[in-house]
Amino acid sequence: MKFQRYGDTDSFAADALEILLENEVQNNLPISFIGNKTDAVRSWLLATVKDEHGGVALTAACTPPFNLILYETRNEPNDVAVTLLSAELKSMGFTFPGVLAEQALAGRFAEIHSCSRYHRHSSMNIMRLDAVSDLPMSPGAIRPIREDDLYFAPYWGRAFGEECNTQVFDIPTTTTNIRRHIGKDTFYIWEDGVPVSQAVNGRNTINGAVVTYVYTPPLYRGRGYASSCVATLTQMLLDRGHKFCALFADAENPISNGIYRKIGYRDVCIYDELKFD
């Protein structure tokens, strides 16, 4: 086994992209990194572990200060590669708060790297849709976010983060991030007299689009607004030429999973986020 770190996204793509595309939905995060030409890549970790024949057995990507993202080729367990990666990261002093990967791989890496000192932060169901199912629409219509939505949208963002237990969304930073979406046809509001739900095209892969930040305030839940917003945005993304859409759903929330399945999304795998203690 041989560990290799890459200094830019092009060289990483040359070795890893074909492997990652074999499970494009599962690997939508590291694939999205490849298209990013930011100067910050110099601080990233883009790496592979190759077997004795030069084939990629394990892919790793990390954009500090976020989690390490892992993928075992064809989801075939390879503890030798995982152990080597852990040793190399410790040797180079590369630190990160946790690991994000298919459930079994995340657990095996965390056991090896942290000597069992970790906890599960979240479990996400990665889902894929190739065609939107026919379903009744709720009253209202979808529209792009506007500047005058910034009086409420950052607070929805903070509430989303709190409910999903993902990260802290402070209002000034969230406002800045949302403002970047204005005029770009990526952030959408479902409006029924007043704004009632939201969904975002958060990133794209080579062939697909990822729907993120789906949120409906408690006052407007149970009326089908989220279903209508997600279904409509999903169809818009397919109409733009994407071959499929993907999203992450809380694996422990049967309500949201049920909503997405009715729209046409299907389970791909469980992704665990494990934090080191």
Describe the residue ranges of each PLM region.
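Short amphipathic alpha-helix that is part of the acyltransferase structural core
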Residues: 1-29, 132-167
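Acyl-donor-binding surface of acyltransferase catalytic domains
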Residues: 63-139, 274
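Conserved GNAT acetyl-CoA-binding A-motif
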Residues: 93-102, 237-249
